[in-house]
A protein has these predicted regions:
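Vicinal oxygen chelate
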Residues: 1-22, 53, 61-72, 76, ...
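Internal, well-ordered alpha/beta segment that forms a basic, Gly-enriched binding/recognition surface
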Residues: 9-47
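Short beta-strand/turn micro-motifs at beta-sheet edges
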Residues: 44-48, 122-125
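Residues forming anionic-ligand binding surfaces in small-molecule and nucleic-acid pockets
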Residues: 47-55
């Protein structure tokens, strides 16, 4: 895979990248490097809540016929391993999700595809004209409390369909 090094402006940190299967760039940042403190002014008083555990996974939406190339890219370049594939319902069709995980286990990606052009994944791919971040899922200790805190800060939350929790119970049983 080809590498890329863009031009950095004055006082900007140059960040190398690798060209992904679709021609987009995957930037490479040294672990623990504080790039944000160099390139951005951080607001004082912001704290990470104790019940925030980190990012559970990032979901990437992509064209159905490109997923094998993405799997090979993550396996070859970064040593990711395959976890599991599942089929997820969308109001307008089915989404097939294949999880891959980094060798250290701290990065998990869901590579999502759909044959239907009406699903949220397909609409996202069409809107952005290719693969891209579809959502980020965060892990927390107390989901209801975290939702209440986010609503107090952010205001609006997406409505939850009436059958959402019934579907979760049917799928996972008493594991909730």
């Amino acid at each position: 895979y080809a590498t890329w090094q863009g031009d950095a402006g004055p006082n900007e940190t140059p960040i190398p990248a690798i060209c992904a299967p679709d021609g987009s760039l995957v930037y490479l940042i040294d672990a623990g490097e504080a790039i944000y403190e160099r390139d951005f002014l951080l607001r004082d008083g912001l704290t990470v809540r104790e019940d925030y555990l980190g990012i559970d996974h990032l979901a990437l939406g992509m064209e159905a016929d490109s997923r094998d190339n993405w799997v090979m890219f993550f396996r070859t370049v970064f040593g990711f391993t395959l976890e599991h594939e599942q089929t997820l319902p969308d109001p307008y069709g089915l989404v097939r999700s294949l999880a891959v995980r980094s060798p250290q286990g701290d990065i998990r990606l869901a590579l999502n595809i759909s044959q239907s052009r009406a699903t949220q994944i397909a609409r996202s791919v069409a809107c952005y004209q290719g693969a891209g971040l579809q959502h980020a899922a965060f892990a927390c200790r107390d989901l209801p409390a975290t939702c209440d805190q986010l609503a107090a800060v952010a205001g609006h939350a997406l409505p939850i369909p009436a059958n959402y929790y019934d579907d979760l119970l049917a799928r996972f049983g008493g594991e909730l």
